[in-house]
């Protein structure tokens, strides 16, 4: 059975709740002692994992819509991407304010440069910022063919974000490995497109070097 436009609207409502409820839980946990012995780290990891979940969900939409023949599912992709950016912003903010502190924000730039896993994280966040800012239909029309070129960078985020997560934990546990494995699987479903993008970039680089 094909999804109707009305059903997609209700699906979006559910996805908004899926983005909001973890935040409400986090607020409750902070105020009622629901976090672990290191609440700052717990907040950072929770916000980062939630951002990664929405990233993977957004990447799942296209192959799911194709294989299930539910093209209206594509309408939920932007929503998932925006929630990914929102949670990634909370993740960055929690590190800046809770780990470094308001009085040490001047150290943020140095930290992002000197710690490789933070460098990967901030690169991912900047890409997500650009994708969120240009996610509207008006920006899509304004950018034309460059819009898709820009939004292909989501695949780079799908590589960098799991590495950032794996690199940030002191002890490798199954959880970050599962996220990394899911990211690899979702990218593998697009291997033809990714191979085409790689060959195009290599050709462009070769042409520039030949000038």
Swiss-Prot record:
Name of a matching Pfam family: Ferric_reduct
GO biological process terms on file: protein repair
Cofactor(s) the record lists: FMN; heme b
Cell compartment(s), UniProt: Cell inner membrane
GO CC terms in record: plasma membrane
Record keyword Nucleotide-binding present: no
Principal subcellular localization: membrane
GO MF, one example: electron transfer activity
Keywords assigned by UniProt, alphabetized: Cell inner membrane, Cell membrane, Electron transport, Flavoprotein, FMN, Heme, Iron, Membrane, Metal-binding, Transmembrane, Transmembrane helix, Transport
Cofactor info, note text: Binds 1 FMN per subunit. Binds 1 heme b (iron(II)-protoporphyrin IX) group per subunit.
Membrane spanning stretches: 8-28, 82-102, 116-136, 153-173, 178-198
Membrane topology: Multi-pass membrane protein
InterPro entries in the cross-refs: Fe3_Rdtase_TM_dom (IPR013130), MsrQ-like (IPR022837)
Listed PANTHER family: PROTEIN-METHIONINE-SULFOXIDE REDUCTASE HEME-BINDING SUBUNIT MSRQ
Protein family according to the UniProt entry: Belongs to the MsrQ family.
Physiological role: Part of the MsrPQ system that repairs oxidized periplasmic proteins containing methionine sulfoxide residues (Met-O), using respiratory chain electrons. Thus protects these proteins from oxidative-stress damage caused by reactive species of oxygen and chlorine generated by the host defense mechanisms. MsrPQ is essential for the maintenance of envelope integrity under bleach stress, rescuing a wide series of structurally unrelated periplasmic proteins from methionine oxidation, including the primary periplasmic chaperone SurA and the lipoprotein Pal.
Subunit text: Heterodimer of a catalytic subunit (MsrP) and a heme-binding subunit (MsrQ).
Protein name listed in UniProt: Protein-methionine-sulfoxide reductase heme-binding subunit MsrQ
Organism annotation: Escherichia coli O7:K1 (strain IAI39 / ExPEC)
Organism phylogeny: Bacteria, Pseudomonadati, Pseudomonadota, Gammaproteobacteria, Enterobacterales
